């Protein structure tokens, strides 16, 4: 299994250690054809991309592509801000980005006060006490599904990490809307049983993302490969390996704006 592109990497514009150029240099060294710079979205309180730095962010990505000959996608890992599925990018933002990832993160500005308490707080305490109520799982599932339906997301990142949901139902929706399920190499997020169920019961497609917060982890797929081997995963369902490149929903959506 050879990675074609790594679409989930971070830089100091959010929570990463190495620059866009350093990540791109590593991608070139590994022979990757494409690299996604997907820093945390604007609503992340501590480690989010800031609008005042967006022009510099874009310029760094374009320059790195010229310097290293690797296609660099200007991306964002947006935050699901509430059960209604708000994911912080507006259509005015779309022209500035090439890649639209989205996942659940903890320390963000939520859509409403109720979302902060029931969605944000509920998941925080569920993680601390290692127990999620059926109501919370239902709420999280609704948040993921609404985010997919209401936003042209390219992938859902680290599904179920710090946000336990019905992964099968989320994957069904992702399949219907052309959104990838990310297999995240940094975080343990789907059990073997959940992933097997998704493969067997849906037509969802997948991409592998390193979620690299440093250049030395760009292109890292080790933990994902170990899980795939355990469950005899059909590699033809992964669209960023062995020469394949994803057919991203966001790019298709923007053609019709």
Task: Walk through the language-model features, giving the residues of each.
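Extended substrate/RNA-proximal surfaces in nucleic-acid metabolism proteins
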Residues: 47-176, 229, 251-257
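Alpha-helical scaffold segments that flank or form the walls of functional sites
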Residues: 21-36, 59-69
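Charged catalytic cores and adjacent phosphate/nucleic-acid-binding surfaces used
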Residues: 1-10, 20, 89-92, 112, ...
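Short, ordered loop/turn segments at secondary-structure junctions
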Residues: 40-41, 77, 105, 186
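Short, solvent-exposed loop/turn segments at secondary-structure boundaries
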Residues: 15-18, 47-51, 218-220
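Divalent metal-coordination and catalytic microenvironments
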Residues: 8, 27, 39, 72, ...
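Glycine-rich anion/phosphate-binding loops
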Residues: 14-20, 85-86
């Amino acid at each position: 299994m050879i990675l074609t592109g790594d679409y989930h990497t971070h830089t100091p514009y959010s929570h990463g250690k190495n620059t866009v150029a350093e990540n791109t240099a590593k991608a070139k060294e590994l022979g990757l054809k494409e690299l996604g710079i997907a820093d945390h979205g604007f609503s992340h309180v501590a480690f989010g991309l800031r609008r005042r730095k967006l022009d510099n962010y874009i310029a760094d990505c374009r320059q790195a592509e010229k310097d290293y000959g690797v296609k660099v996608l200007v991306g964002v890992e947006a935050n699901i801000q509430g059960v209604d599925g708000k994911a912080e990018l507006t259509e005015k933002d779309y022209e500035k980005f090439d890649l639209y990832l989205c996942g659940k993160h903890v320390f963000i500005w939520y859509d409403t006060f109720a979302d902060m308490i029931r969605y944000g707080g509920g998941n925080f305490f569920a993680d601390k006490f290692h127990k999620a109520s059926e109501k919370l799982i239902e709420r999280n599932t609704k948040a993921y599904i609404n985010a997919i339906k209401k936003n042209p997301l390219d992938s859902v990142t680290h599904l179920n990490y710090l946000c336990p949901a019905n992964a099968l139902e989320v994957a069904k929706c992702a399949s219907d809307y052309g959104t990838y399920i990310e297999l995240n190499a940094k975080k343990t997020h789907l059990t073997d049983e959940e992933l097997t169920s998704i493969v067997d019961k849906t037509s969802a497609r997948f991409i592998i993302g390193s979620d690299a917060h440093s250049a030395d982890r760009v292109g890292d797929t080790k933990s994902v490969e170990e899980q795939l081997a355990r469950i005899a995963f059909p590699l033809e369902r992964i669209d960023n390996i062995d020469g394949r490149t994803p057919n991203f929903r966001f790019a298709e959506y923007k053609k019709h704006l």
